[in-house]
C-alpha cells in the first residue's frame, strides 16, 4: 500500500513536527541555569532552560508511518496486526531500547476475544527520572464515521490515528540513541486494543460504548509492568 503525498500526509508531518516541540520540554524540564539582571544592585535571578537533546526528523517519522500502513489495517487478531507487532518491536530494539510485551486476552463489547499486545520500550532503564510517552498501534476495524456509508464496515488504515503516534516514538528512540540524555529515561508504550469501541451502526450494544474503548491502556493501568 503506497501512501501518496496528500493533504492527510502533510497533516501527519505537521503533527510530527508538533510532537517535536512537545519533546523539547522532555529534554529541558530538568535542566536549569541562572540569568542575572544587568542592573547593579539587583540580585534577583531567574531559572532558564538550557536547550539540549536531539533534533526531531519528521521525514523519518513519516517513513515509519508509511511502513506500518504497508502491512495494511492492523486490526485485532489479523495477520497484518501480528506482522506489525514484530516490526515495532524490532525497530525499538534497533534503536537501543529495552523492550517487553504485555499480552492479554481482552473481551470486546460483543464477546470477541482480542489477542492484545502492549509494547513497552524503555531507554536508559536505570534512570530514576522517567517520562512516559504513549500511543496506540491497532487499527479500527470499521470506518463508521466515514461520510460514505458504504465504507462503514470496512477497516481503517489508521495512518494518522494509530501509526503516526508510534512513528513519532520510534523516531524519538532513534534520536535518543544518537544523542542520549543520561539523567532521563523514556518509557514508550504502544497500546493495543484501543480502537475496538462499539461502532455507530451497531444498535445492540450502545449501552456499553463507554467501556468498549481503550482496552489495552486500561489493562496496562491495572497491571503495571514497569518497576
Model-flagged regions — what are they?
Residues 8-19:
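Bacterial N-terminal signal peptides that target proteins for export
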Residues 27-30:
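C-terminal motif of bacterial Sec signal peptides marking the signal peptidase cleavage site
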Residues 33, 38-84, 95:
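N-terminal capping segment at the start of a domain
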Residues 60-67, 79, 83, 87-94, ...:
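Extracytoplasmic/secreted proteins, especially bacterial periplasmic and envelope-associated proteins
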Residues 66, 73-126:
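A non-catalytic alpha/beta surface segment that caps or lines the substrate-entry region
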Residues 68, 102-104, 123-124, 134-138, ...:
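Active-site-proximal beta-strand/loop segments in catalytic clefts of secreted hydrolases
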Residues 140-146, 196-200:
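Short acidic/His/Gly/Ser-rich catalytic and metal-binding motifs that mark active-site loops
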Residues 153-227:
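Acidic/histidine-rich catalytic neighborhood of metal-dependent amide-processing enzymes
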Amino acid at each position: 500500500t503506497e501512501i501518496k503525498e496528500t493533504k492527510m500526509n502533510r497533516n501527519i508531518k505537521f503533527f510530527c513536527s508538533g510532537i517535536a516541540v512537545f519533546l523539547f520540554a522532555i529534554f529541558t524540564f530538568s535542566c536549569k541555569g541562572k540569568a542575572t539582571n544587568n542592573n547593579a544592585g539587583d540580585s534577583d535571578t531567574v531559572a532558564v532552560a538550557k536547550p539540549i537533546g536531539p533534533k526531531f526528523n519528521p521525514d523519518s517519522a513519516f517513513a515509519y508511518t508509511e511502513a506500518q500502513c504497508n502491512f495494511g489495517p492492523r486490526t485485532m487478531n489479523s495477520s497484518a496486526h501480528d506482522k506489525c507487532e514484530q516490526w515495532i518491536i524490532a525497530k525499538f530494539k534497533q534503536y537501543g531500547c529495552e523492550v517487553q510485551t504485555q499480552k492479554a486476552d481482552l473481551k470486546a463489547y460483543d464477546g470477541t476475544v482480542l489477542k492484545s499486545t502492549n509494547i513497552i520500550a524503555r531507554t536508559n532503564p536505570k534512570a530514576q527520572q522517567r517520562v512516559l510517552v504513549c500511543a496506540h498501534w491497532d487499527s479500527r476495524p470499521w470506518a463508521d464515521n466515514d461520510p460514505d456509508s458504504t465504507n462503514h464496515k470496512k477497516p481503517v488504515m489508521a495512518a494518522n490515528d494509530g501509526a503516526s503516534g508510534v512513528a513519532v516514538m520510534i523516531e524519538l528512540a532513534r534520536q535518543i540513541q544518537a544523542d542520549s540524555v543520561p539523567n532521563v529515561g523514556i518509557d514508550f508504550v504502544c497500546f493495543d486494543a484501543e480502537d475496538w469501541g462499539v461502532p455507530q451502526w451497531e444498535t445492540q450494544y450502545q449501552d456499553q460504548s463507554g467501556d468498549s474503548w481503550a482496552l489495552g491502556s486500561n489493562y496496562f493501568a491495572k497491571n503495571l509492568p514497569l518497576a
